[in-house]
Amino acid sequence: MGRDSSFWLSPVFLLPVTPPGNFSSKDSNIPQILTNFAETSNLAFMINFECDYTEGAHASILQRLAETNMEQTPGYGKDRHCENARQIIRRVCNAPDADVHFLVGGTQTNKTVIASILRPYQGVICVETGHIAVHETGAIESTGHKVITVPGINGKITPQLIEQVYRRHFDDKGLEHCVQPGMVYISQSTEVGTVYHLNELEAISAMCRKLELPLFLDGARLGYGLAASDNDTSLADIARLCDVFYIGGTKIGALFGEAVVINNPSITPGFRYMIKQNGGLLAKGRLLGIQFETLFENDLYMQLSRHAVEQAMRIRCALEAKGVALAYASTTNQQFPILPDSVIEHLSDRYIFSTTEHLTPGMTEVRICTSWATLSENVDRLIDDLDKAL
């Protein structure tokens, strides 16, 4: 298979074929049975901008996993690959004393970290659009902890909002009848594609330390945040300002995996117990270590992140040039244009994206999401079709 080959899932089988954007029924590497199926069923190969985890993994990761496949290593993250990845992450974060753990997915990681920090009567403060509040099926609440939401500003929380929640609770004479704020959760980049700037993170961190509330940063899309044109933070800044955060792999080139970085030593005791209790202690833990070793070799993590952001910003610029309003000032890989329903219908026979909110009659906010693997040719096609439809 060539470098640009991928797997296309048909309703009946999984076969290696040319990517959808380059599909040709005459291509010699497409089995005739698939060609016949496409012709008889009018199967359309869609270009997917729905999310940033539709593809598998970067070829370097797959190659490294194959090369190490027959190695015999200890389980549960105690192998040499995980240890090497820990050392690499400590170095790039300028956090030599950080405790680093590898988990499989974002919801599992959020649930494990939050449950490790909070007492049974405490909750976690986050904005209304926070992932733990709206897209985790009550995972945090299932542990007995309330998610205390506040209205964010462009998807972001502020020190003032944090202090308001804290004061409202502790100034109440009947405070023991209510859930006590116990920590703060933020995302970088946010769920709406915006980023926290260094002065914002410093102010939030200072407020959290003043109120003795641990600060947890969800980094599922951290690479995309670091690659944003207006970003002025580094991994070292985040490690310095947050009690705990994680570096997302699932959405940025890995098959799966999130690297939790704990900088507050009070969180460390018992954390592996919590990982195990939440089903996150992977027996073949080396699969996680190898992926993060590879992502942080030769700046691959940031190369992949920059590619996704560059493609998203091409789309944003094209939309702005046509006078399309965008719901958020996103500088990352997620863009939220407000489009006429007629345009959405016109595009829907070729493109997949998410509908986020129906606004005024005939107008809908959608999410267009690029990834580390988005083909520039597919962005060209989308821009061309948008130009024709608008």
Pin down the residues of each PLM region.
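Active-site C-terminal subdomain of aminotransferase-like
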Residues: 154, 180, 187-190, 195, ...
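Catalytic PLP-binding core of fold-type I/II PLP enzymes
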Residues: 196-228
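PLP-dependent aminotransferase-class I/II
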Residues: 144-182, 186-191, 196-203
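Conserved N-terminal alpha-helix of the aminotransferase class I/II PLP-enzyme fold
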Residues: 58-106, 128-133, 139
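Conserved C-terminal alpha-helix-loop-beta "cap" of PLP-dependent enzymes
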Residues: 119-121, 313-388
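Conserved PLP-anchoring active-site segment centered on the Schiff-base-forming lysine
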Residues: 116-134, 163
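Short, positively charged and aromatic/hydrophobic N-terminal segments
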Residues: 25, 29-42
